[in-house]
């Protein structure tokens, strides 16, 4: 029996976003006061992300038993991430040159007030490759969870899962316990998700109330260029990848619509991480691949952030009349490839990453970030949406490469023919 439409989660979230926009526009002070609702929902999700990743990764690796397979899956995922990330960076660069959203501003960087971006610049710094990998290693096992650092939690989880796999049957009781604890945490996720419309309402009301729809007008061309480029990336680049793997990107996007609407309302792709992992298993991807690819992708496969990085840098150069040589642009691509790996799915992290990129590329003034500060929140939503679609597609692709994709179930679920049975199968797995 179908649910009444008003009880469907994505309908509730969509309605909440609409009401939030109206409240923020007509009563901006009240809209700004709704910020705690959005923040509370994000904190609830972040509270559960660490345990979810730990249990899923540990269970997946321990279930593999073969350490060569763990390395193979991780290697294939990283290879895919780097290839697709490069396409995203290049597409952002090409689109900005083609549509020229920054041409005509004629801004003198010396006249820009940098006080508003000081908090972002202070958090950003150029990070070498060695520093990046050293950061992945936590000071203690517990500090990884206390700080909520996805990469550090992933590191701890991989060591723990590998140890269980090596010990074998003697550790079976621990493996089974982790599986059971995982079910408890996913149940908590389902409970938290019920308040997603409230979180989306609060976050959207705050965004519109603080920044206002009027702040979009001067930079509509940049926003339009970014959204158009992201759509082209999803339909053409990810669409081609999906077609080669044997599924439709349109059907896939429709399949994760609830997660996308939660992300749209909160501007954070982390808000949908637990649900995305569950949906990928339901779709026919193996639990072990989902456990490795999805959490890793949240730091290494941020397609929307990559598009934004090169687009924002070139926009600032155009707006301040700075001519960049081919070598300088290639340097920007290389730097962005590294700095984007430090971004997470949290609201505002893309702007901090942009500051880190500009700090390493002195040709373009960091002060130019002031030009896009007012619209960054509106672009953050598109970044997060593109990121989550990219990570979902990556999971299906790596599962297919590992021959651990149930293609029959994939087809049935995307066509909406196997909702109940596939959910039961996923739970059994």
Curated annotation (Swiss-Prot):
Its main location: membrane. GO terms for molecular function: fumarate transmembrane transporter activity; malate:proton symporter activity; succinate transmembrane transporter activity. It is a multi-pass membrane protein. Keywords: Cell inner membrane, Cell membrane, Membrane, Symport, Transmembrane, Transmembrane helix, Transport. It holds the Pfam family SDF. One of its GO terms (cellular component) is plasma membrane. Disulfide bonds: none annotated. It is found in: Cell inner membrane. PROSITE patterns: NA_DICARBOXYL_SYMP_1, NA_DICARBOXYL_SYMP_2. Gene3D superfamilies: Sodium:dicarboxylate symporter. The chain crosses the membrane at residues 8-28, 44-64, 77-97, 148-168, 188-208, 222-242, 307-327, 355-375. The keyword Cell inner membrane applies. The keyword Metal-binding does not apply. InterPro entries: C4_dicarb_transport (IPR023954), Na-dicarboxylate_symporter (IPR001991), Na-dicarboxylate_symporter_CS (IPR018107), Na:dicarbo_symporter_sf (IPR036458). GO terms for biological process: L-aspartate transmembrane transport. Belongs to the dicarboxylate/amino acid:cation symporter (DAACS) (TC 2.A.23) family. PANTHER family: AEROBIC C4-DICARBOXYLATE TRANSPORT PROTEIN, PROTON/GLUTAMATE-ASPARTATE SYMPORTER. Responsible for the transport of dicarboxylates such as succinate, fumarate, and malate from the periplasm across the membrane. This is C4-dicarboxylate transport protein 1. It comes from Cupriavidus metallidurans (strain ATCC 43123 / DSM 2839 / NBRC 102507 / CH34) (Ralstonia metallidurans). The gene is dctA1.
């Amino acid at each position: 029996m179908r649910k009444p439409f008003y009880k469907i989660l994505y309908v509730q979230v969509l309605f909440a976003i609409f009401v939030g926009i109206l409240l923020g526009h007509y009563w901006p002070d009240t809209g700004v006061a709704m910020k705690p609702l959005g923040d509370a929902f994000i904190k609830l999700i972040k509270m559960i992300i660490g345990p979810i990743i730990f249990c899923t990764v540990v269970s997946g690796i321990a279930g593999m038993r073969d350490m060569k397979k763990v390395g193979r899956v991780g290697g294939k995922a990283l290879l895919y991430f780097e290839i697709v990330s490069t396409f995203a960076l290049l597409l952002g660069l090409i689109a900005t040159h083609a549509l020229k959203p920054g041409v005509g501003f004629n801004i003198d960087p010396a006249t820009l007030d940098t006080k508003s971006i000081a908090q972002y610049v202070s958090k950003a710094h150029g990070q070498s490759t060695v520093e990046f990998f050293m950061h992945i290693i936590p000071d203690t096992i517990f500090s990884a969870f206390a700080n909520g650092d996805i990469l550090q939690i992933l590191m701890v989880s991989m060591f723990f899962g590998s140890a269980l796999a090596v010990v074998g049957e003697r550790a079976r009781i621990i493996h089974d316990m982790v599986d059971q604890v995982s079910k408890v945490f996913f149940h908590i996720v389902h409970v938290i998700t019920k308040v997603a419309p409230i979180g989306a309402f609060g976050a959207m009301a705050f965004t519109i109330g603080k920044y206002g729809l009027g702040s979009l007008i001067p930079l509509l061309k940049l926003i339009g260029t970014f959204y158009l480029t992201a759509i082209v990336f999803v339909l053409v680049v990810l669409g081609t990848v999906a077609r080669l793997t044997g599924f439709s990107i349109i059907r896939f996007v429709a399949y994760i619509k609830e997660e996308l609407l939660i992300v749209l309302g909160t501007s954070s792709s982390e808000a949908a991480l637990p649900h995305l992992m569950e949906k990928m298993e339901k779709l026919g991807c193996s639990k072990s691949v989902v456990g490795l690819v999805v959490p890793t992708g949240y730091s290494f496969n941020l397609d929307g952030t990559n598009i934004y990085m090169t687009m924002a840098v070139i926009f600032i150069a155009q707006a301040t009349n700075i001519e960049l040589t081919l070598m300088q642009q290639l340097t920007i691509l290389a730097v962005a490839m590294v700095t984007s790996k430090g971004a997470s799915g949290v609201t505002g992290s893309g702007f901090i990453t942009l500051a880190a990129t500009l700090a390493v590329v002195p040709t373009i003034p960091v002060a130019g970030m002031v030009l896009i500060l007012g619209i960054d929140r509106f672009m953050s939503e598109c970044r997060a949406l593109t990121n989550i679609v990219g990570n979902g597609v990556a999971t299906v692709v790596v599962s297919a490469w590992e021959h651990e994709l149930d293609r029959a179930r994939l087809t049935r679920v995307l066509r909406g023919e196997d909702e109940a049975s596939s959910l039961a199968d996923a739970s059994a797995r």
